From Swiss-Prot:
<comment type="similarity">
    <text>Belongs to the class I-like SAM-binding methyltransferase superfamily. CmoB family.</text>
</comment>
<feature type="binding site">
    <location>
        <position position="102"/>
    </location>
    <ligand>
        <name>carboxy-S-adenosyl-L-methionine</name>
    </ligand>
</feature>
<dbReference type="GO" id="GO:0002098">
    <property type="term" value="P:tRNA wobble uridine modification"/>
</dbReference>
<comment type="subunit">
    <text>Homotetramer.</text>
</comment>
<feature type="binding site">
    <location>
        <position position="192"/>
    </location>
    <ligand>
        <name>carboxy-S-adenosyl-L-methionine</name>
    </ligand>
</feature>
<keyword id="KW-0808">Transferase</keyword>
<keyword id="KW-0819">tRNA processing</keyword>
<protein>
    <recommendedName>
        <fullName>tRNA U34 carboxymethyltransferase</fullName>
        <ecNumber>2.5.1.-</ecNumber>
    </recommendedName>
</protein>
<feature type="binding site">
    <location>
        <position position="126"/>
    </location>
    <ligand>
        <name>carboxy-S-adenosyl-L-methionine</name>
    </ligand>
</feature>
<dbReference type="InterPro" id="IPR029063">
    <property type="entry name" value="SAM-dependent_MTases_sf"/>
</dbReference>
<feature type="binding site">
    <location>
        <position position="107"/>
    </location>
    <ligand>
        <name>carboxy-S-adenosyl-L-methionine</name>
    </ligand>
</feature>
<feature type="binding site">
    <location>
        <position position="311"/>
    </location>
    <ligand>
        <name>carboxy-S-adenosyl-L-methionine</name>
    </ligand>
</feature>
<dbReference type="InterPro" id="IPR010017">
    <property type="entry name" value="CmoB"/>
</dbReference>
<dbReference type="Pfam" id="PF08003">
    <property type="entry name" value="Methyltransf_9"/>
</dbReference>
<feature type="binding site">
    <location>
        <position position="196"/>
    </location>
    <ligand>
        <name>carboxy-S-adenosyl-L-methionine</name>
    </ligand>
</feature>
<comment type="function">
    <text>Catalyzes carboxymethyl transfer from carboxy-S-adenosyl-L-methionine (Cx-SAM) to 5-hydroxyuridine (ho5U) to form 5-carboxymethoxyuridine (cmo5U) at position 34 in tRNAs.</text>
</comment>
<dbReference type="GO" id="GO:0016765">
    <property type="term" value="F:transferase activity, transferring alkyl or aryl (other than methyl) groups"/>
</dbReference>
Amino acid sequence: MIDLSPLVRRLAGTPLASWSQGLQAQLDAKLEKGHGDLDRWRGALEALPALQPSEIDLVNGLRLDCDCDDATRAQMRQALMGLSPWRKGPFDLFGVHVDTEWRSDWKWSRVGPHLDLQGKRVLDVGCGNGYYQWRMLGAGADMVIGVDPNWLFFCQFQAVQQYLPELPAWHLPFALEDLPANLEGFDTVFSMGVFYHRRSPIEHLLALKDCLVKGGELVLETLVIEGDENQVLVPEDRYAQMRNVWYLPSVPALARWLRRAGFSDVRCVDVSVTSVEEQRSTDWMRYQSLSDFLDPNDHSKTVEGLPAPRRATLLARK
């Protein structure tokens, strides 16, 4: 069982205290339903060697280290491989380099400098395996809760957390819809790589706003296209082989949507074209990746002939 009592204690006296009281039962109910591969992934977690990190770096990346021998490293590598595919990272865990599909550290280096997370209560919606949660703590966040219903990501988070049990980061295998309305308890809310999967983009923005305290900040990172405030791409079918991509607005259109949803002080802090160096297949993620989804003769287009992935990060205030 995963014990959430430290989280409940952490949230005592905050606007999230009443919500926290029901989290253990909510988590236990989710775990009871489970997933067909959960036992296998738990086996991988149990196979991780018992180590105590003497070096912890969450500022320059995600690196844990201590004195350990080659046999222990081999055990670590085999156990972590049992949790493949690894999407977000990279992680350096006691001499084992988990070379993930995404160079998420590149994204963080673009986004992080624009944020003030010092002492903030943070929610990361669609947090994946929690890579960014650890980086948020490295940037001074007081605590970080991530929500993502993907069970493999949940187990990957547990793999890192078991070496950092005292740090105030929690991963809940919930969807945003599992959170109560009008939560209004987080200083900063992240939605990175989620927005374009939502069929109702304005509803998503309103739900994110509901999670923020008054004056809190939204960090929204999503796929965009070039164009003016009236330009929005709605793929006819797939986008970069993904069926679940609905809306790719231009940056000015997205800024307008944020204002329409009631946000203020909207500003774009980064726009980057995703390269095949930033997202690619590795030993830790052996499936198809970005290069397979782009036109082989013209990387400015997807295989469907649509504009290649371009990502923007916008900040907005409640």
